[in-house]
């Protein structure tokens, strides 16, 4: 109990104060440990997504900046969307989730023939149709990861991957 009855025994008061200080210090250490673990988990997730994105870009012959640019643009668009309208009340963590998931938008390109993927110049209509399948290929790849199907990142990444070339105009 937190109450000490009168008359006060100074030894009991002293022990209670020390125990309270120790508990507070332990709680702070635990909070710091959990915070560090969450940070490490987030860092590792972003690192793995960056590695996958780099693999796709390397195979595609892109500079390595495409995914970073998409990530930055997604973040900027989401911030403006939240500022301009109440229609999409996205929290900071939701915006970061969407931004992270956007890094996987072109993962389906790994399933496209290199001759088409790295062709200099314009694609033929047939090649264009094949290239357009990268959205379906990527979405299927993500959908096949059934053990992660309920994860928010996977759900958002699937939607972005599948529909990022659709035009709503």
Tell where the protein language model's regions lie, with residue ranges.
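Conserved Rossmann-like nucleotide-binding pocket used by diverse enzymes
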Residues: 4
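The C-terminal output helix
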Residues: 18-36
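C-terminal output helix
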Residues: 7-17
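Short, charged amphipathic alpha-helical "coupling" segments at sensory-output junctions
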Residues: 32-47
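Histidine- and acidic-residue-rich, metal-dependent catalytic cores
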Residues: 43-169
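Residues at alpha-helix boundaries and the short loops/turns that link adjacent helices
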Residues: 7, 20, 24, 110, ...
């Amino acid at each position: 109990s937190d109450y000490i009855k009168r008359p006060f025994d100074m030894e009991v008061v002293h022990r209670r104060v020390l125990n309270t200080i120790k508990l507070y210090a332990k709680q702070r250490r635990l909070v710091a440990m959990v915070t560090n673990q969450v940070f490490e988990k987030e860092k590792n997730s972003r690192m793995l997504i960056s590695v996958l994105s780099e693999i796709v870009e390397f195979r595609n012959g892109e500079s390595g900046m495409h995914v970073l640019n998409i990530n930055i643009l997604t973040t900027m668009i989401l911030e403006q969307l939240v500022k301009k309208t109440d229609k999409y009340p996205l929290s900071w963590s939701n915006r970061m989730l969407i931004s992270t998931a956007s890094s996987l938008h072109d993962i389906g390109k790994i399933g496209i023939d290199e001759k088409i993927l790295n062709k200099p110049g314009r694609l033929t209509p047939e090649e264009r149709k094949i290239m357009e399948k990268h959205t379906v290929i990527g979405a299927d790849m993500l959908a096949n990861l059934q053990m992660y199907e309920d994860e928010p990142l996977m759900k958002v990444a699937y939607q972005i991957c599948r529909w990022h070339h659709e035009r709503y105009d």
